[in-house]
Design a protein with these regions (language model features):
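Alpha-helical transmembrane segments of multi-pass inner-membrane proteins
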Residues: 16, 67, 108-141, 148-181
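Non-cytosolic membrane-interface motifs at loop->transmembrane helix junctions
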Residues: 78-85, 141-147
Length: 181
């Protein structure tokens, strides 16, 4: 069972960058499932070291503070909607940390996946800029803004700039691994 859950965790981590191209639903589901896989694997393997990090403890305390603060709000239900589910991002980050520590190929494969996504988005954006439509034959209608696969949402630059630090970090980790070996 642990084997299948760990494979599920790794594949969900690989698919999350692709899911981010589709909208918010699939990445949220992926983050939640990764967090659940992480919780299961750490309980099944009795691997508590990930929970003992000072920054993780700080984020758990901060999440508890947000939930406690939400209970003091005038609109409790709306407030809980916003604060209660932030904890899934802590578990998602822990799941990625768990995968990076326990599965050495994750760094190189995730680097390749992000490279493919970056190249695809840049080529699609250039096609959209010069031809007026993208690879999926969606017309370019935004006023002086290339949207690529994001359609009406003008978030291409935001997507690329937010993934750039992750991409550079993976590049550094990948090169450090080569130098160590």
């Amino acid at each position: 069972m642990n084997y299948y859950v760990s494979k599920c965790l790794v594949y969900l981590i690989y698919l999350t960058p692709f899911f981010l191209l589709t909208g918010p639903a699939l990445p949220d589901i992926s983050a939640t499932l990764c967090g659940l896989c992480f919780i299961y694997l750490t309980i099944a393997n009795k691997d508590w070291k990930f929970y003992k990090s000072k920054i993780v403890i700080f984020f758990f305390i901060f999440s508890f503070y947000l939930i406690l603060n939400s209970s003091l709000s005038n609109n409790i239900i709306h407030s809980y909607e916003n604060s209660l589910f932030y904890i899934r991002f802590i578990f998602f980050a822990l799941a990625i940390w768990y995968a990076l520590v326990n599965y050495p190929n994750v760094i190189s494969k995730l680097f390749v996946i992000l490279t493919v996504i970056f190249i695809f988005l840049v080529i699609d954006s250039l096609i959209q800029f010069y031809l007026g439509y993208n690879i999926f034959l969606i017309e370019y209608r935004a006023a002086n803004r290339i949207t690529s696969v994001f359609g009406q949402e003008s978030i291409l630059g935001s997507f690329l700039i937010r993934f750039l630090p992750i991409y550079i970090s993976l590049l550094i980790l990948k090169n450090n691994k080569k130098n160590i070996n």
